[in-house]
Design a protein with these regions (language model features):
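ABC-type nucleotide-binding domain
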Residues: 5, 10-13, 19-281
Length: 281
């Protein structure tokens, strides 16, 4: 929410139209973005297929988070264009753009409101039954009934405290995941979604994230490579350019940047991978 709720200086064009997403194809075409006269993203070309799950990998400062901020149209490009289903994001309303993109981040900032209000933040007109269904999918139904606040409210009516301070890190992430399940946007961004959690909690939440990724176009950023190694394709950024791309196995064989990062994190050991579950046709 911190990213989606930030102050935006870019204004809609006078004739901006609502974004219509029927497939979820994302294209970065000759994209260049500069900060302090330095190209952070440098002539980048990337096409993400409808329903494809990709992981963005790279050393600190490679441009991973900048790429996400550009997709959300927080900044103006120096060059190029970003298309969603063939529609330039500069030509659509920002509200419609962000309605079609859901975000789970490392720093889950919740409102100082009730659990229910936080879950319905992305879709305020949702029914309680729809909210309960999202909570079950996020596996948050176990702890919510036990929550209480100083006003004497409990469960879904309990206030979570400023930035969700009354909840554990795992509980905050489950509320955030329930919110995204309820929003049901066709494009999903996971930005270090589990990096702040311990291994046991991370493993439990990863199952919910796998369910969340079904039938969506997904872009995931993670420093912990084992959490994204099962993606359809991994994109390795280096100084704002695509240095490598392929599956985990292909990149290990290339023995390049990705293989070096993997070796450093795992000591060469392969970790068990859990493919993203696909819905049966």
């Amino acid at each position: 929410m911190k990213t989606l709720g930030r102050s935006i200086t870019i204004q809609d064009k006078p004739n901006a139209k609502d974004l219509e997403v029927k497939q979820g194809v994302i294209e970065f075409k000759d994209v260049t973005f500069a900060y302090n006269s330095k190209n952070v993203i440098d002539n980048l070309n990337l096409r993400i297929r409808a329903g494809e799950k990709i992981g963005i990998v790279g050393r600190s400062g490679a441009g991973k988070s900048t790429l996400i901020q550009l997709l959300l149209h927080f900044y103006q490009l120096k060059q190029g264009e970003i298309l969603i289903d063939g529609q330039n994001i500069e030509d659509v309303t920002q509200d419609s753009l962000r309605r079609n993109i859901a975000l789970v981040t490392q720093d889950t900032s919740l409102l100082h409101r009730s659990v229910a209000e936080n879950i319905k933040y992305g879709r305020p007109n949702a029914s309680d039954e729809e909210m309960y269904a999202a909570v079950r999918k996020a596996k948050a139904e176990e702890f919510i009934p036990q929550l209480t606040d100083l006003r004497g409210k409990s469960g879904y009516e309990a206030y979570v405290g400023e930035r969700g301070v009354k909840l554990s890190g795992g509980q905050r992430q489950r509320i955030a995941i329930a919110r995204v399940f309820l929003k049901d946007a066709p494009i999903l961004i996971l930005d270090e979604a589990t990096s702040a959690l311990d291994s046991e909690v991370e493993a439990a939440i990863q199952s919910s994230l796998d369910d969340l990724m079904q039938d969506k176009t997904v872009i995931a950023i993670a420093h912990r490579l084992s959490t994204i190694a099962q993606m359809d394709r991994l994109i390795v950024l280096d100084e704002g350019r695509i240095a490598e791309q392929g599956t985990h196995e292909e990149l290990i064989q290339k023995n390049g940047i990705y293989a070096h990062l993997w070796q450093r994190q795992t000591g060469g050991f392969l970790t068990e991978q859990h493919p993203i579950k696909k819905k049966e046709a």
